[in-house]
């Protein structure tokens, strides 16, 4: 019974699901009447989404279609970091959205502070792009999971390797 229980807090985006959502969004854009004759497109370049359209209004519509498809495929949209709208070739506008993979140092500190404020007997350890939480009591780990889920973090977090 002296064995410690642990879990990892991670922030991941499943790239195959993102690709599927992009394909479905592109089909909808091709079939929608308000996009007929427009140069709207969505591309995935490594971990950056590139949205292109005729003007900012249509770009916002492309973004709305993409977000709806990402939500349906359970891809966390909190992990999308949108850049500025910029002019592209051929009278089009472009916007880049970076997929944030992993927990950066600032968010790891926020998670660490949330856990420390609970004053439970748990240990936290920041490992590269994840946070490991260890405790003797599984009830304490469940309380930590509930607290981190209810916290308003700028990224979406998942809990894996619960042992």
From Swiss-Prot:
Task: Name a GO molecular-function annotation.
Answer: nucleotide binding
Q: Which Gene3D superfamilies match?
A: 3.30.70.860, YajQ-like, domain 2
Secretion signal: which residues? none
List each coiled-coil range.
none
This entry carries the following GO cellular component terms, namely: cytosol
InterPro entries per UniProt: DUF520, UPF0234-like_C, UPF0234_N, YajQ-like_sf
Q: Which UniProt keywords apply?
A: Nucleotide-binding
| Pfam families named among the record's database cross-references | DUF520 (PF04461)
Report the CDD domains cross-referenced here: YajQ_like
What HAMAP family would the database entry show?
YajQ
Q: Which PANTHER family match?
A: UPF0234 PROTEIN YAJQ
The Swiss-Prot or TrEMBL record describes its family as follows: Belongs to the YajQ family.
Job of this protein: Nucleotide-binding protein.
Its protein name is Nucleotide-binding protein BCG9842_B4128
